[in-house]
Swiss-Prot record:
Its main location: secreted. It comes from the Eukaryota. The keyword Signal applies. Keywords: Amidation, Disulfide bond, Ion channel impairing toxin, Knottin, Neurotoxin, Presynaptic neurotoxin, Secreted, Signal, Toxin, Voltage-gated sodium channel impairing toxin. This is Mu-theraphotoxin-Hhn1c. InterPro entries: Huwentoxin-1. Disulfide bonds join C51-C66, C58-C73, C65-C80. It comes from Cyriopagopus hainanus. The presence of a 'disulfide through disulfide knot' structurally defines this protein as a knottin. Expressed by the venom gland.
Length: 86
């Protein structure tokens, strides 16, 4: 009787440890996943801030308009505009 009670308690303790370990791994995984998603969002925001969009004020000597969108800084208007013909 004492042996069976001891085995039952040991089994419950082992089950508790295994469940707790798997639950903490799931939490770590979800935290890592969430932090990686947020890191991707932060990187995309950083890229958006590096260049100026259409119609934004700019300095022709330091052209910061988005080259990927074919924008250049107009010397006349000092605004980002689309470059036509290139």
């Amino acid at each position: 009787m004492k042996a069976s009670m001891f085995l039952a308690l040991a089994g419950l303790a082992l089950l508790f440890v295994v469940c707790y370990a798997s639950e903490s791994e799931e939490k770590e995984f979800s935290n890592e996943l969430l932090s990686s998603v947020l890191a991707v969002d932060d990187n995309s925001k950083g890229e958006e801030r590096e260049c100026l969009g259409f119609g934004k004020g700019c300095n022709p000597s330091n052209d910061q308009c988005c080259k990927s969108s074919n924008l250049v800084c107009s010397r006349k208007h000092r605004r980002c505009k689309y470059e036509i013909g290139k």
